[in-house]
Each structure stands twice: as C-alpha cells, then as structure tokens.
C-alpha cells in the first residue's frame, strides 16, 4: 500500500486522457448517526472489480478546504489510479473520497460535530461490509491535502491499529507559536477555535488540552 501512495504522489499531474477509467461512483451517501445527516462520498473501483472475488486494499482520500469532488475533478485521481494499474506499477485497489466539509476530520471539543467518530466507527466499517476490501491494517491507507493532510495525520495517529500508511500533502498544521499568534481573531475562531476550543482567546490560552490531544 505504501507503494500505491508513492506513485499517486508522483502521478497526480500530467495525466493525459487516453486511458479508460475504472468504475467511478460519485454522489454516493451514507447516513451518519454521529453527524445526524447524510454524508456524501465517491468510490472508485478498479477495472474488473465486478467480475472477480478479489479483496482489495483501500485508500481513503481527504480533501482540503473545498469539497470532496476536487480530487476527481482537479486531481485526476481516477485516471492516475487506472494508469498505474495498467502499467503494472501497482496492484488494483479501491479509492474512497468522503466529504469532509470544514471539519478537519476531527470531533469538535464540545461534541457538536463528530466527524472522526463518523469516519472510524461508521464509514470504514460500512465500506468493509459493502465492498470486497482487505480488512487488515496493511490494507488501509489515508492520503490528505491541506486540511485533509491535517486530518490524515491526526486520524491515523490516534487509530494506528486501522491504517498501515499515511501521506499528508501540504498539511495545514501549525507550530505552537504559529497557533498562538495566528490572526485575525475571527478567522482563527472560525478555523481552529470552533473545533479545538479557545474561541476569543489569545496566546497560550489557545493551547487547550483538546488541541494538544488532536494536533499532529
């Protein structure tokens, strides 16, 4: 699975349109009791999935600020996947792209939004139960960009028994000094304070115990 992540990084740009695409299912959804709403996701199945009994490794892809369609629309990830498989550089795998909203893929400190709980307790088991996946640590990986990079590191570090590898591309992470000094206050409150606590605070008062538990 680590080889898959490496090649995806190398091939995320410069893909031409000459390759047939794997099975691409966009606009799928799952109801989340933790979030109390439907959560959209896309899933890309390797060519030949429908005609085999193989169990495939799964790559979960966390997007940055924006929405979950950006990996497919701008990142060409389905073409990347298909090209690498056809060239024999990697073995076939399943790609899952959930809508992460602006959650940083974290549970909020006050319990008002439980995205990590949804991902770990609901989405991963749902994918394992409804698709032919490898259900072991070496069969699951996460890759994330920006906000998704933060989430990939944060989620995988607290759930090491589930994920065998992780890649964070330009992750939205801060040193403690940057976190304490970042402004303007309203922007910090909306981006960080609402998730990790410390709304309206400055300096070391922003370094809540909840933030320290979740910051990569």
PLM regions with names:
Residues 19-216:
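Non-catalytic cap/lid and distal C-terminal segments of serine-dependent acyl enzymes
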Residues 4-14:
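Sec-dependent N-terminal signal peptides
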């Amino acid at each position: 699975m680590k080889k898959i992540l490496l090649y995806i990084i190398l091939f995320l740009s410069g893909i031409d349109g000459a390759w047939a695409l794997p099975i691409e299912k966009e606009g799928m959804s799952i109801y989340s009791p933790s979030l109390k709403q439907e959560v959209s996701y896309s899933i890309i199945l390797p060519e030949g999935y429908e005609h085999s009994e193989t169990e495939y490794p799964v790559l979960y892809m966390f997007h940055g600020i924006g929405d979950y369609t950006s990996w497919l629309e701008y990142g060409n990830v389905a073409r990347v996947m298909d090209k690498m498989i056809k060239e024999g550089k990697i073995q076939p795998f399943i790609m899952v792209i959930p809508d992460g909203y602006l959650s940083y893929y974290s549970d909020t400190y006050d319990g008002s939004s439980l995205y990590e709980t949804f991902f770990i307790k609901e989405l991963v088991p749902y994918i394992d139960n409804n698709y032919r996946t490898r259900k072991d640590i070496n069969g699951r990986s996460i890759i994330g960009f920006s906000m998704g990079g933060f989430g990939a590191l944060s989620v995988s570090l607290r759930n090491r028994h589930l994920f065998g590898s992780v890649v964070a591309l330009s992750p939205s992470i801060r040193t403690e000094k940057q976190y304490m000094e970042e402004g303007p206050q309203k922007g910090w409150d909306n981006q960080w304070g609402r998730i990790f606590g410390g709304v309206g605070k400055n300096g070391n008062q922003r370094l809540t115990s909840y933030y320290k538990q979740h910051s990569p």
